């Protein structure tokens, strides 16, 4: 295994001495330099593999990168070399936006958690697509998911317009498209998870996808990312709505607004979505309920609080077909990818 994998625990104190968002940027820039120098070429080959079928696609393994780490699709190739079975980038909005004021990302180390209120900060669809089309990841067999959202200044009643623009833009370049309706950092966005609102949005996206599928001679799977802060009744309504509108998969889950697991910790009162270890059990409950409701009709990608191979296994056992990592990478480093794949491979024997 590359020395850079083993060096992350040594580098972490220096990174954690920085502002969380600055450390994020420094880490991505360092990874890109390592990729450009050829240092990362062996990483992918060093990782255990576990071929997995997901929504008709063949993944090298069922451990993916969650959206949010690379919002602008600028580091796809470098991230793809860490051994992920699939990579998801975004969320991208039609127009560039700066997001919420800084500071807007906070670590809670005692809980292996993170709070962010970034607010879909990104360079916009045109810049995003320029980065995606420059990437070689897909041409080398990688599976790429592109995550779309709405601009903060788009009225919620016009949200479908932004998603339709996003879908049309990313469609030719995506192996699957994720519709992000669950970030807590865009005002009223989670209202789109309601039955009527969700049904109207998905009906519009379904019709647009049919048009794009004919135009591009291929049907790209459509996935919806949902929140963990849902009642069982709400989960059932969402599941039924996804099924009735021809959606292919669901990502469970996004960040939580709950602070029950981190009360009293520094930064716990900050506004934003909480990710990391405290989300694991919440995500498991949503996955279990979804699987009970949809049977095998929908693919489920489990995300939230995976900091070990065992927790990846628990997501799969709860009903997920694949998993994604984000905050766990901040606390554990890139070695977490191989650990999760290895654990799942051993479980499958």
Curated annotation (Swiss-Prot):
The protein's name: Dihydroorotate dehydrogenase (quinone)
PROSITE patterns the record matches: DHODEHASE_1 (PS00911), DHODEHASE_2 (PS00912)
Binding site for substrate: 71, 116-120, 180, 185, 254-255
Primary role: Catalyzes the conversion of dihydroorotate to orotate with quinone as electron acceptor.
Keyword presence, Oxidoreductase: yes
Lineage top rank: taxon: Bacteria
E.C. number(s) listed in UniProt: 1.3.5.2
Pathway it works in: Pyrimidine metabolism; UMP biosynthesis via de novo pathway; orotate from (S)-dihydroorotate (quinone route): step 1/1
Gene it is expressed from: pyrD
Subunit structure, as described in the record: Monomer.
Main location class: membrane
GO CC terms of this entry: cytoplasm; plasma membrane
Molecular function GO labels: dihydroorotate dehydrogenase (quinone) activity
Annotated residues for binding of FMN: 67-71, 91, 147, 180, 225, 253, 276, 305, 326-327
Cofactor: FMN
UniProt keyword annotations, A-Z: Cell membrane, Flavoprotein, FMN, Membrane, Oxidoreductase, Pyrimidine biosynthesis
CDD domains, per database record: DHOD_2_like
Co-factor binding details: Binds 1 FMN per subunit.
Family: Belongs to the dihydroorotate dehydrogenase family. Type 2 subfamily.
